[in-house]
């Protein structure tokens, strides 16, 4: 809903960057549509604006499934890649590190001529496999360490992984963040009653303040300097978007 996001941006004073592309759930009405045809729609979102508005996308997104890039999501990945090649906008990638799915995604991007220094492989702190994460970084990509507090790996171990990557010399391409969901449907309890708060709020009561209240103090305790924290949370995201 680009109009809603524009209203929130104006009311809050926060710069919200709209996304074009598609997430994990491939819609039935797009089955059989070619990557080139999809790319035309994504490019229109960037150059003209989302349909019925003059609000333009500033970043491209694609996704993979848990174990691999399905045939349908490969079409979407190639469409996103072609959109990037045409527009030069950065590409954020929903990935699953537990299956090392980024290896398949990066292969597709190479085939499509993507500049891998404009790619960010997200949800990467769902693993502590440092060698796999280094491999992604060695391809030129940014690493989205963006599932705080997360569930598959403890918040502290996510930060330990982040610190290990900083120590290994990759600090200029790491982007820690929340992947926080603040609005979602309330699900009833087994007895049919409604909970007083959403499960996401119970899991992460700090919501968008989690990084500030939990992660940055943890990093400082590990010896990460203020300058390095500035690089992680300000300089790296800016460089990723600006190119």
Where are the language model's segments positioned?
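Active-site gating/metal-coordination segments in enzymes
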Residues: 7-10, 15-90, 141-142, 147-152
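Distinct, well-ordered alpha-helical segments
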Residues: 71-75, 98-113, 129-137, 162
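Divalent metal-coordination and catalytic microenvironments
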Residues: 84, 143, 179, 229, ...
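Catalytic beta/alpha-barrel core
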Residues: 90-97, 118-126
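Short acidic/histidine-rich active-site segments
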Residues: 146-147, 171-194, 198-201, 229
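Mid-to-C-terminal alpha-helical segments outside catalytic/metal-binding sites
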Residues: 203-243
């Amino acid at each position: 809903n680009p109009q809603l996001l524009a209203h929130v941006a104006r009311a809050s004073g926060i710069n919200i960057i709209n996304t074009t592309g598609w997430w994990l759930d491939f819609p039935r009405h797009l089955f059989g549509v070619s990557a080139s045809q999809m790319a035309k729609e994504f490019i229109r979102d960037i150059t003209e604006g989302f349909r019925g508005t003059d609000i333009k996308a500033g970043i491209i997104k694609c996704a993979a499934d848990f174990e691999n890039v399905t045939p349908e999501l490969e079409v979407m990945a190639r469409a996103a890649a072609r959109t990037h090649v045409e527009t030069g906008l950065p590409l954020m990638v929903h990935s699953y590190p537990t299956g090392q799915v980024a290896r398949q995604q990066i292969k597709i991007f190479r085939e499509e001529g993507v500049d891998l220094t404009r790619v960010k492989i997200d949800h990467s702190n769902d693993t502590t496999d440092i060698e796999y994460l280094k491999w992604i970084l060695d391809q030129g990509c940014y690493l989205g360490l963006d599932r705080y507090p997360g569930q598959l790996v403890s918040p502290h171990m996510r930060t330990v992984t982040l610190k290990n990557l900083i120590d290994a010399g990759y600090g200029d391409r790491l982007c820690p963040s929340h992947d926080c969901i603040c609005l979602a449907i309330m699900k009833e309890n087994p007895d049919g009653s409604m909970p007083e708060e959403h499960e996401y709020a119970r899991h992460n009561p700090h919501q968008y303040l989690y990084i500030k209240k939990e992660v940055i103090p943890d990093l400082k305790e590990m010896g990460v300097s203020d300058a390095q924290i500035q690089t992680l949370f300000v300089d790296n995201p800016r460089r990723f978007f600006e190119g």
